[in-house]
Swiss-Prot record:
Family to which this protein belongs: Belongs to the vitamin-B12 independent methionine synthase family.
Keywords: Amino-acid biosynthesis, Metal-binding, Methionine biosynthesis, Methyltransferase, Repeat, Transferase, Zinc
Pfam families according to UniProt: Meth_synt_1, Meth_synt_2
Entry's EC annotation: 2.1.1.14
Residues reported to bind L-methionine: I433, G434, S435, E486, D601
Protein name: 5-methyltetrahydropteroyltriglutamate--homocysteine methyltransferase
Residues where Zn(2+) binds: H643, C645, E667, C728
Keyword rRNA-binding (UniProt): no
Top EC class of this enzyme: transferase
Cofactor(s), by name: Zn(2+)
Recorded name of the encoding gene: metE
GO molecular function: 5-methyltetrahydropteroyltriglutamate-homocysteine S-methyltransferase activity; zinc ion binding
Described purpose of this protein according to its UniProt entry: Catalyzes the transfer of a methyl group from 5-methyltetrahydrofolate to homocysteine resulting in methionine formation.
Cofactor note: Binds 1 zinc ion per subunit.
Amino acid sequence: MLTHTLGFPRMGAHRELKKNLESYWKGAIGQEKLMASGRELRLRHWRLQQQAGIDLVPVGDFSYYDHMLDMVAMLGAVPPRFGWQGESVDLDTYFYMARGSSGHRTTTAMEMTKWFDTNYHYIVPEFYPGQRFRLARNRLFEELAEACIEGIQAKPVLPGPMTFIALGKEMVAGFDRWSHLDAVVEVYEEIVSRVAAKCSWIQLDEPILATDVPGPIRLRVRDVYRRLAAVAGPCRLMVATYFGALQENLDLALSLPVDGLHVDLVRAPGQLEKVLPCLPENMVLSLGLIDGRNVWRSNLRQAISTAQDAVVARGSDRVMIAPSCSLLHVPVDLAGEAVLDPRIRSWLAFARQKCQEVNVVRLALDGEDVTEVLQANDTAMENRRKSALVHRDAVRRRMADISPDMYCRRSSFEERKKQQAWLRLPTLPTTTIGSFPQVAGVRSARRSFKQGRISEEQYRAEMQRYIREAIAQQEALGLDVLVHGEPERNDMVEYFGEQLAGFCFTENGWVQGYGSRCVKPPIIYGDVERLKPMTMEWTTYAQQQTNRPLKGMLTGPVTMLCWSFVRDDQPRSATCKQIALAIRDEVQDLEQAGIKIIQVDEAALREGLPLRKSAWREYLGWAVDAFRLTASGVADSTQIHTHMCYSEFNHIAEWIAKMDADVISIEASRSNMELLGVLESFTYPNDIGPGVYDIHSPRVPSVAEMVELLRKASEVIPLERLWVNPDCGLKTRAWPETLASLRNMVAAAQKLRFFARG
C-alpha cells in the first residue's frame, strides 16, 4: 500500500520564499539567489515528507507565485498586453502577469480570485479568439530531474486540463473558452509524454469534478483523458478530486481511462460507499482521509476503520492513503509552536504531522503495532471533547436569548438615508476601505511591544503618531470619509481574534494567501465571547483629530469564520453566530462613543459559498443573518458600511441586498467592472462603491482610467447612490503609490461631479 500527498506548503516554515520573492522584486537579490532558495525549499520539503513516511512525493506543487499561473506559463497562454514574443516564458514575464509591473513596464495584472472555497488565491487564465498554445516553460521537467537526482520517488502534479479551462475566463464577449480545449490538451499530451519516462505516477488535479459541471463539458472529459492515457505509456495517471463529493460526476470519474482516482473523504465521507461497488477492477483508489484544509488532529481509529473497509473491498495493492487535498492550506510544522497552550497544541496537526498521520493509517493496515500512537490520539480526542477551554456557559445562554428583532434595522433604507443626511456628504463621496500602508516603523513598534521591548506608553505614542499622519494625509487628499489607517492591526482577523475568547494564535502558523502574501489564520477552538472593547481607543482618538466623518472599522463574523481554522465539533453556523454577538457589542460601543459610520467588512462572504449551488441557500441564510445580527442594533442615523472582495455576484445579488447595509464597497476594477453586468439585471437598492483601482498591483492608475470606470458605473448606478473607493485596503502598498493613486481617485470623482453638474 502506497502513501502520497497531493501537495505541500511552498513558503517554508519561516516564510523563507516570501522574503526572497520580495527581495527579488525590490532588486535586492538576483534571479540566481531566488532560484537557489527555491531549490533549497523544495529539497527540504521533499525530505520532510519522505521522512514522515510518504512514498510518492509531489513535484510541481511548488510555485514562485501560483500553480495556475505556472500552467499559464507552461502552455504559453500569456495575454497579449504583456508583450510576450513567443519564446520561453521567463521569470520576469511570469511575475509581470501576476503583478502588472516589471521594471519600467506597467499594465493591468491578470485577475486573481479564490481557489474554490479556500483562502488561497489563484491567477485566472485568460482566453482569446485565435490564441495559440505551446510548451513554453520547462520548470516541471527541471524540478522532476532535481527530485530524481536526490533519490525522491516523485509524482508530478498538474492542474488538470478541465479544471484549468473551467477556472479561466473569456476576454472577448461571445467567445467560448472551451473551443481551445483540443489545443490545450495537445500541450498536455507533450507534457505527460515527457515526464512519463521518469516517474511511475502523474497526478492531474480535477477538483472541478466536485462542482456542478455543465453537461456539454462533462461529455468531453473522457476523450481528454483517453488522449492523455495514450501518451503516458507505462506511467500511471491519477485524477485527483477534492473539496467535495463527486455526486453526479461519480460515474464519469469512474469511467475515465486512468489508473487511479483520489476522493475527498473528509468533506464527503459518505461517498466511499458509493465509490467502492462501482470502482473498475484495474483502478487504484486514493483515500483522502486526513484533513488537508484544517489543523485538527485526525481521529485515527476512524480513519483506519474507513481505510480497512476499502482494503477489504479492493485489496491493499489497489488502495492508497493520502490527505484529502493539498497541504498547501495548512502551516508546515507544529514543532515550531513553543508558546501555544499545550492543551490546545495536543489537539492540532500541521502539514508534517498530517504526513505522519497518513503513515500511521498505512502502518496499521499493514499490520504494524501502532497501539501507543492510537492511545495518544484517543486521549487528545477525549480531552478536547470535555475541555472547559472549549465550552462557555455564558455564550450558550446568550445564544438561546437571540430574538427575531435583533436581526433587523429599525427603518427602511430610504428612511435611514434621510436620517443620515446630517453627514453632509457630497455626490460621489470618496473614501478608502480601511487600512493604510504599514511602514517598517509601525510593524517594528507592534513587534517590540508584543515582545516587551517598549512600554505601553511608547507603543501608544507611535500608533497615535501614525493615526495623526494618516488623518492629515486624507484631509490633504480631500477624501470625504476618513479612516484611522489600522496601524495597530497586523491582520484584520487576527487583531480581533486576539481579543476574543475562543480564539488562539500560532507563532509560525503561516499559510500562503497569494504570491508572497502569507497569513497566519487564528484557530477557533471554543465558544467565542468579547471580553472587552477592541477598537474604541484608536477609533475615538482618530475622530478627535478631524471634523470629517470617520469610519469605525470592524471585521464581520463570516469573514472571521472563513479566514480562520474553525472548530469542527459544532456547525459553522453556530460558531458564526457566536462571533456575530461579539462584534455586535463592539458596534454598539462605537456608536455610543460618537462614531456614526461603522464598517463591518464581509470580504469573505462570497468565498464561503459551498461549491454546489444546491447548498447555497442554507449557507447564505445563516451568513446574512450573522451580518444582520452584528449590524442591526444601531440607530437609523448611524450609517453601516460593508466591504466585499471579488465581483462574481450574479447569483447572490439578492442575498447581498438582504444584508441591508447602507453602503457596500466591492472589489471591481481588476475585473474591469464585471460587477456592473450584474447590476444591469438586478437593481441594488442601497448605496454602492465599486472599486475603481486594483490595490494588489503597485501600478498607479491614471485619472482618465478611473473616470472611465466611474462613468461606466454611473450608467447602471444612480449618482446619488454611487461611492468612490479603491478595491480593497491599502496595507500592503507603499505610501508614494498610495498617495498618488488616491490623489487621482479624488480627482476622478471631482471630474465626474463636474460633468454631472453639466
